[in-house]
Curated annotation (Swiss-Prot):
Transmembrane segments: none annotated. GO terms for cellular component: cytosolic large ribosomal subunit. It holds the Pfam family Ribosomal_L30. One of its GO terms (biological process) is maturation of LSU-rRNA from tricistronic rRNA transcript (SSU-rRNA, 5.8S rRNA, LSU-rRNA). Part of the 50S ribosomal subunit. This is Large ribosomal subunit protein uL30. It comes from the Archaea. GO terms for molecular function: RNA binding; structural constituent of ribosome. InterPro entries: Ribo_uL30_ferredoxin-like_sf (IPR036919), Ribosomal_uL30 (IPR039699), Ribosomal_uL30_arc (IPR005997), Ribosomal_uL30_CS (IPR018038), Ribosomal_uL30_euk_arc (IPR035808), Ribosomal_uL30_ferredoxin-like (IPR016082). Keywords: Ribonucleoprotein, Ribosomal protein.
Amino acid sequence: MAYAVIRIRGRVGVRRDIADTLKMLRLHKVNHCVIIPETETFKGMLQKVKDYVTWGEIDKDTLVKLILKRGRLPGNKKVNPEIIKELTGMDVEELAEKIINGEIKLKETPLKPVFRLHPPRKGFERGGIKKPFSVGGALGYRGEKINELLEKMM
């Protein structure tokens, strides 16, 4: 299983250790998204930055859409299925399946590891970006509902 992690809050007033963890996750700016494997190390990092990001389990269909719509190659070149097939030797669906199952990491592919997203259409949840998802906000763990948020942000 793989997590999609999206940075929600900015950099003003962030403690140094949390800023370092966000940097290690490659979440330098708001509305940036990374795909990480579900390991104990990453779970600990997510718990540390839970007040600045939201995360959940991404499904295959959403990852395919994310790669095709927001994936970039070095030099900020757009991605299409033919380029993916040429560079990796597999189609986009197969690549997404292997990333989700943890067989390969996104950084082992020619794609850039960070996806730059739009702010969500119709905004975040009613509670805003200062409250956890569990009480109606946008922060923290949200499980399968991360796919709905990613659809709104693509």
